[in-house]
């Protein structure tokens, strides 16, 4: 038999089950072989599937290397309908919430604003009390 460029794989798995003093053997085996030509076709197929997946991902989610406006032509029909303007929000357009002393902001917490909270300060101050004597140990009879 002449030597060929063949890759083969054989797997055998034997599982012995002992149940109620009865030995049952389950054996499975699988084997496959492929020539170099088959491996080349398999590699090309995997590469094609990977390339198609990357293209679909770029089309759906956008690719950082690709421009975002692939489907928009510079001279499109939008210029006939009207002017489209892109503006950025001004600082006055931002939503602001009123400051409430019982709800410190993140900046206040970062700068130590919680230490200026009256509840925090009252608990942090030392409590002056007199030491209490320990009770006598229990009497054993």
From Swiss-Prot:
The chain crosses the membrane at residues 40-60. One of its GO terms (cellular component) is membrane. It is found in: Host membrane. This is Non-structural protein 5. Keywords: Host membrane, Membrane, Transmembrane, Transmembrane helix. It is a single-pass membrane protein. Belongs to the aquareoviridae NS5 protein family. The gene is S7. The lineage of its organism: Viruses, Riboviria, Orthornavirae, Duplornaviricota, Resentoviricetes. It comes from the Viruses. It comes from Aquareovirus G (isolate American grass carp/USA/PB01-155/-) (AQRV-G). Disulfide bonds: none annotated.
């Amino acid at each position: 038999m002449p030597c060929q460029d063949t890759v083969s794989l054989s797997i055998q798995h034997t599982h012995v089950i002992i149940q109620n003093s009865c030995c049952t053997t389950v054996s499975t085996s699988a084997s496959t072989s492929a020539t170099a030509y088959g491996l080349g076709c398999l590699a090309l197929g995997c590469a094609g599937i990977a390339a198609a997946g990357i293209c679909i991902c770029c089309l759906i989610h956008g690719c950082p290397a690709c421009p975002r406006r692939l489907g928009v032509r510079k001279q499109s029909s939008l210029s006939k309908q009207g002017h489209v303007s892109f503006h950025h929000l001004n600082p006055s357009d931002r939503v602001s919430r009123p400051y409430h002393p019982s709800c410190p902001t993140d900046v206040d917490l970062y700068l130590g604003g919680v230490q200026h909270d009256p509840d925090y300060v009252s608990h942090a101050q030392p409590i002056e009390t007199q030491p209490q004597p320990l009770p006598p140990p229990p009497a054993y009879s």
